[in-house]
């Protein structure tokens, strides 16, 4: 579910998603109000990146863009916190979560950006209480609950049920109620850190979807993230399923 213009970038995005095997159910918007979003990313020699992002038409995502059949049939719904800035984006999230839950699915979010959390802290806190899982890094959790990390995760687990905290090269913490898994991370110097958070979420959610334990799901997220930071670009260049099997 998303929103792109019918310009060159929008058509390329929709076509590439379909080519990769993912249905992009919202066709490019003819004469859309803004151009398709884009991001210019500068990668320094230490692999860290600085992003200059224009959200464009994506920021206009609203409840009418949420497909009943898609959100209402999802076993796992994943929301992207970057689109939570505008009222219509918040309405879209709430509608998608409601449709997913009515059908018995699980809905969650990646907090995405501590500055976005700062801007909408109260709304995020309300949203988290309606979700089944939340993924964030240590800075985003601290921003959301305005306390130390341990206390923030305890509060988050009480609110959302399942919470994940990534810590940029340090152990990942996964907590559900009183159950906590600490997943070790092998520190490496990245070639390009772009996409690390997205790929962690992908690996982790694939683990949950296939019935893996919290620790195994966390490990799968780490394996996926490690692959994408080993080369330039935000998409994996290796068969991740094969990599999961290789890593045990």
Name these PLM-found stretches.
Residues 5, 11-30, 37, 41-182, ...:
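Ribokinase/PfkB-type carbohydrate-kinase core domain
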Residues 98-99, 149-248:
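Conserved phosphate-binding/catalytic region of the ribokinase-like
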């Amino acid at each position: 579910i998303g929103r792109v213009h019918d310009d060159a970038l929008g058509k390329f995005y929709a076509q590439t998603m379909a080519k990769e095997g993912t249905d992009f159910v919202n066709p490019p918007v003819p004469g859309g109000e803004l151009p398709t979003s884009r991001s210019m990313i500068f990668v320094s020699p230490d692999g860290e990146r600085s992003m200059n992002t224009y959200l464009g038409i994506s920021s206009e995502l609203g409840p009418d863009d949420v497909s009943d059949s898609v959100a209402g049939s999802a076993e796992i719904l994943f929301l992207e916190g970057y689109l939570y800035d505008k009222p219509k984006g918040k309405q879209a999230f709430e509608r998608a979560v409601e449709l997913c839950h009515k059908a018995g699915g699980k809905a969650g979010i990646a907090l995405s950006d501590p500055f976005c959390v700062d801007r909408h802290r109260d709304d995020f806190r309300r949203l988290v209480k309606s979700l089944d899982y939340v993924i964030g890094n240590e800075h985003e959790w601290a921003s959301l609950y305005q306390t130390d990390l341990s206390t923030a995760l305890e509060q988050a687990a009480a609110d959302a049920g399942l919470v994940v905290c990534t810590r940029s090269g340090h152990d990942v913490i996964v907590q559900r109620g009183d159950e906590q898994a600490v997943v070790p991370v092998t520190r490496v110097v990245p070639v390009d850190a772009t996409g690390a958070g997205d790929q962690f979420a992908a690996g982790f959610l694939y683990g949950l979807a296939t019935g893996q334990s919290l620790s195994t799901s966390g490990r799968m997220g780490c394996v996926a993230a490690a692959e994408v930071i080993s080369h330039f670009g935000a998409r994996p260049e290796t068969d991740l399923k094969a990599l999961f099997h290789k890593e045990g």
